[in-house]
């Protein structure tokens, strides 16, 4: 087909070409979408647009929905279903999603369905995310699904309507970037630390205009859930798309999932999936290399994910800034975060700890936190420490393993699934001036609540901080 890549191809090239419907002279392309994930925040206007135009979804079984952003995570509110949501706006949005899914016959995992959860946890968990797919959602962290060798990215509300109506999107192809992490990670260093270190190196604009493929020995060794954590934060590195090549781990993870192909279709799918890797002689527009052995546990100190340092270091001084723009950004960050240049991370008094979000709420994350917490108690100075599983099924599995009791005995809150304190769109919020060790993906001003101060860390680092009351190096905890 005209417009497809000639010669050796990257994984991104292959996925793009396999879904290219047509291309115009200006470079704009029509791309077919295999899977569309919906939630309550970015879908209402899209459904309304369909109704006003008298249209129906083009391919019903390509769409699936679940409420996550606005749902409360306290047991009290959840027991009453949608009617129990105290915030009016949140209740209306969740109810509207429910109504729209019924009207258009779209499968929804509703608020009290055991399968409900954060959309980027639910998709892979159910086998809705499959290697080689194009996956979109009205959410910027859709790159999570790239961990399966997918072309996955977030879209806006008008594009949500367009996908519902046509199963296609107009896009322009990105350039190719390879981020290779060689060697092996040290003890206590996790996928979250890897992606934070990457962002610290290339900055939040480093991936702008690129589709990032993550490669190297560290990613070959990494679990699928770990790869999801890394791909999840491709957007924080400036890229809409992040992906990892398919391997045996990918196929093993997908096998027997509810929506995964079965029988002969499975065999055909696996044959295709095994081609989903960059050709040996494929050329990338940009290559970034890190040594995995040099990566330490990371802690963000400022108001951007790129303001991140190893736990062994202190808050940087203005003398370390590369230019006037960075000096100005750091000065503002010092003021907002209530920190001083050169301050030790251990001197930051924490108020709350949040372990959850589409970045770190899967069973491996909860196990890692529980391993640190077991037999210990949350520091008396911590106002709140909470564990929010990414889905009802993750919660169920953790409870079957007894992990909920580990946290409850330590003084953590064990919550219902949802986006929770990742963003200030539900009842889980920081108060002005509070510092939070968070396993989420963004530390912007006000992200977790007006005046709230967010520090991004791994689940293990967050758990250790909850016990100590401040940041500590989990490697020696």
From Swiss-Prot:
Q: Which residues constitute the signal peptide according to the record? A: none
> Any keyword Transport?
no
What's the cofactor?
[4Fe-4S] cluster
State the Gene Ontology terms under molecular function. 3-isopropylmalate dehydratase activity; 4 iron, 4 sulfur cluster binding; metal ion binding
Please give a single GO biological process term from the UniProt record.
Answer: L-leucine biosynthetic process
* UniProtKB keywords: 4Fe-4S, Amino-acid biosynthesis, Branched-chain amino acid biosynthesis, Iron, Iron-sulfur, Leucine biosynthesis, Lyase, Metal-binding
Pathway connected to this protein = Amino-acid biosynthesis; L-leucine biosynthesis; L-leucine from 3-methyl-2-oxobutanoate: step 2/4
Binding of [4Fe-4S] cluster, residues: 358, 419, 422
Q: Per its UniProt record, what InterPro entries does this chain match?
A: 3-IsopropMal_deHydase_lsu (IPR004430), Acnase/IPM_dHydase_lsu_aba_1/3 (IPR015931), Acoase/IPM_deHydtase_lsu_aba (IPR001030), Aconitase_4Fe-4S_BS (IPR018136), Aconitase_4Fe-4S_dom (IPR036008), IPM_dehydratase_rel_enz (IPR050067), IPMI_cat (IPR033941)
EC class (word): lyase
**Enzyme nomenclature, EC number:** 4.2.1.33
Q: Which reaction does it catalyse?
A: (2R,3S)-3-isopropylmalate = (2S)-2-isopropylmalate
What Pfam family does this protein match (any one)?
Answer: Aconitase
Recite the UniProt cofactor note for this protein. Answer: Binds 1 [4Fe-4S] cluster per subunit.
The subunit field of the Swiss-Prot or TrEMBL record says:
Heterodimer of LeuC and LeuD.
Record family assignment: Belongs to the aconitase/IPM isomerase family. LeuC type 1 subfamily.
Q: Which PANTHER family match?
A: 3-ISOPROPYLMALATE DEHYDRATASE, HOMOACONITASE, MITOCHONDRIAL-RELATED
**What does the UniProt record say this protein does?**
Catalyzes the isomerization between 2-isopropylmalate and 3-isopropylmalate, via the formation of 2-isopropylmaleate.
HAMAP family (alphabetical) = LeuC_type1
What is the name of this protein?
A: 3-isopropylmalate dehydratase large subunit
Q: What is the phylogenetic placement of the source species in the record?
A: Bacteria, Pseudomonadati, Pseudomonadota, Gammaproteobacteria, Moraxellales
